Every structure is written in C-alpha cells, then in structure tokens.
Regions:
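Acidic/glycine-rich phosphate/pyrophosphate-binding loops and surrounding catalytic core
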Residues: 2-195
C-alpha cells in the first residue's frame, strides 16, 4: 500500500481518537495543570515482548503538539523486557497528559499483536510456512494492526477488498458455483486491465 495512503489513514485515526477522547478539552488537566508547566515522561516497559508502535506514537505527539520532544531508545521490532525504557517525551505537561492514553493504547495493542505474531513465526522457523494476517481486524485499526504483524515478523496478505481477488465460499455460492465464480472473476480482471 502507498506510504501516503498509510500516513493519511493513521493521521485520520489519530484525529478521530483525539476527538473521541479529548473532545472539547481534557477538563481535569486543563483545570489543575498550569498551561506553561513543562515536564518529562518515560515509556517504561512492563511486560516481555516485541515492541511495536513507536513510529505511530511519535506521530500522536507531533500531531497534538509539535513542540513535544521525543527521544527513542528502543525501535519497533525489538525484544523488550520489564524495566526497559522505550522512549522519553518532554514538553508541556498538559500535552503529555492528554496524549498518554492514546499513545499507550496504540502501543499496547500493536506490541501485543507483534509479540503474538513473533511467537508463531519462531515456532515455524525451519519450515516453508509463513505467518500472514487477514482482514479480520478492528475497525479503523487495520493499518496499525497490519503494521504490527510485519513488525512481529509476519507478512500482510491483503489490505482490503481492493487489492486482490479472493474467492470465498459465499462468493462461490452466490455466483452459482466455483466455475461461474472463477470465469466471472477472470472476465472482470480482463475488463479492469483494458480500462
């Protein structure tokens, strides 16, 4: 998938997440933290696994407050253990508090997927079998979940309905059998190539 399309999808998810979580403002933070208060926070690893989501987290911070400074110590795809510090973020305390939950939710989900994928990849080492993902993803999170699979050592099968024909039982049934489904798919592809 085109990098610009991926970036756009991630940006839209981040914006939607801000709207969902912050709305017209984090009233707790805005009410008790001075606007000019500066601080620093660190992402401390609590479980062993494969780290994923650092690049998305950096984008969360950048989109919310471009003045935030992020120092990354551990890259996506790295095996981590409790006590490791993945990154330190410095900036306005209001910005730190308003972005922390979104960053944590994204990184926990992506790291969980990358860790599980990596376990399967390791079990299959030495065979000719590859771990591939599916379209059975969380609505709105597909791109990030598929990124996590790749970070964990797996591969992406297809992103959506637009990038590959995959005849399944429902297609075969509604087309009136496998022969009809295959021949119609071939005709469709020929027509698509001509246009």
């Amino acid at each position: 998938m085109d990098e610009l399309v991926v970036k756009d999808l991630i940006d839209r998810l981040i914006d939607l997440s801000f709207a969902e979580d912050i709305g017209d403002g984090d009233h707790t933070t805005l009410s008790c933290i001075p606007a000019d208060a500066m601080g620093k926070s660190k992402l401390l690893i609590k479980e062993e696994g494969i780290l994923a989501g650092i690049e998305v987290a950096k984008e969360v911070f950048r989109r919310f407050d471009p003045t935030m400074k992020v120092e990354v110590f551990i890259q996506d795809g790295t095996h981590v253990k409790p006590g490791d510090v993945a990154m330190v973020v410095e900036g306005k305390v209001q910005s730190l508090l308003q972005t922390e939950r979104l960053m944590l939710n994204i990184m926990q989900r992506m790291s969980g997927i990358a860790t599980m994928t990596n376990k399967y990849v390791k079990k299959l080492e030495g065979t000719k079998t590859r771990v591939l993902d599916t379209r059975k993803t969380t609505p709105g999170m597909r791109i990030m979940e598929k990124m996590a699979v790749k970070i964990g050592g797996g591969g992406n099968h297809r992103i959506g309905l637009f990038d590959m024909i995959l005849l399944k039982d429902n297609h075969v049934d509604f087309a009136g059998g496998i022969h009809n489904a295959v021949s119609r798919a071939k005709e469709y592809c020929k027509a698509k190539v001509r246009t």
